[in-house]
Structure formats: C-alpha cells, structure tokens
Regions:
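Generic N-terminal amphipathic, Lys/Arg-enriched alpha-helix
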Residues: 18-39
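Active-site cofactor/substrate anionic-group-binding motifs, chiefly glycine-
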Residues: 65-118
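Conserved catalytic cysteine-centered active-site region
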Residues: 116-129
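Glycine-rich anion/phosphate-binding loop at the beta-strand->alpha-helix junction
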Residues: 126-171
C-alpha cells in the first residue's frame, strides 16, 4: 500500500473549534484493528479492514477512511454485519464469477472478489467478478490497487443509493 505523507494520517478531533491531530499510520491502524477485534472481527480480518480504512485516509479519500469506523463498529456490535462470513463463489466460468459475501464487511468481500478476479484474469486474460450480500464496500481504489500490484488493470465499483440529482436534473 501507499506510505502516504511520511506514513502519517491527519485525524480530525471534534471540539468547539475544529482541530487536527496527526498520528503515525501504523498507530492508527493498530488502534482501528483493536476496535474491530473488540467488536468480534477475527484478528486477520480486523487488520485488513483497518489497513483499508487508513489507506483511504492516506490517499485523501477521507469519506471512506477511518471516518467509517463508528458505523462499522456499530454494525458489528448490533449484528447487522456478520463478523465471520463464509465468503464463497456461487457460480463461475473461466473469466467470471459471482461471489456471496454472507453479510460480511465490504472490505473483506471486496478483497475476496478481487483475489478471484485476479486469479481468473491471470488465467483467462481478463475477468469480471460480482458480489452480493455484502456490507459497505469501502474505498474502491483499494481493490483496484490490488490488481495493479500484480501488473493488471483492475476496476472496482459498487451500487449505492441515489444521493444527488444528475446535472440538469431535479431528482
């Protein structure tokens, strides 16, 4: 992953006046992973999700970084998110697959789907993988970088609720 700006992450601290505290990315990752483990996520999965959140912040995608931690922790605590999903391939061909996320954390399902896609692309030349029954996906660029690290072109995308009108639109 990216080392960011000297491996440090600015973290907003909410007080009467907005301030920022800068911490080492490694410290932040360890803290986030600890919180996720405390909510029932297995250690290796907690480490991966924490790394994906901190990486988003290091890349400037703060909307999908550590800002997401309260939601992720709450959804684990309230059993909205499955902390130990049995992620699996539902159906597949030489260059495609459908993955069932079993209600697991989006970063875990996204990683699995991209790993399947990478393996198929290396074998078939290109591949498409879809996933269902997954929670919040996180930063899509994180998964595309997994493909880039293997000298592949990766695209990652997800569905979302409409949140703003298209240019010239009212709804």
């Amino acid at each position: 992953g990216s080392a960011g700006v000297a491996g440090r992450c600015p973290i907003p601290t909410w007080t009467r006046e907005m301030t920022q505290t800068t911490v080492a990315a490694s410290q932040l990752t360890a803290m986030v992973a600890g919180i996720l483990r405390h909510q029932g996520l297995p250690p290796e999965d907690a480490d991966f999700v924490a790394a994906s959140l901190v990486e988003a912040d290091l890349r400037g995608v703060h909307s999908h970084g550590v800002l997401r931690l309260p939601r992720y922790a709450r959804e684990l605590r309230e059993q909205i998110t499955n902390p130990r999903p049995q992620i699996r391939v539902l159906d597949e061909g030489p260059a495609w697959a459908r993955v069932d996320g079993d209600g697991g954390m989006g970063p875990l399902v996204g990683r699995y789907a991209m790993q399947v896609g990478i393996a198929k692309a290396l074998s078939a030349g290109s591949a498409v993988v879809t996933a269902c029954r997954s929670r919040h996906f996180g930063s899509a660029g994180f998964y595309a970088l997994m493909a880039a690290e293997r000298d592949l072109i990766g695209m990652a995308m997800t569905v979302a609720s409409p949140s703003l009108a298209p240019t010239g639109g009212r709804q």
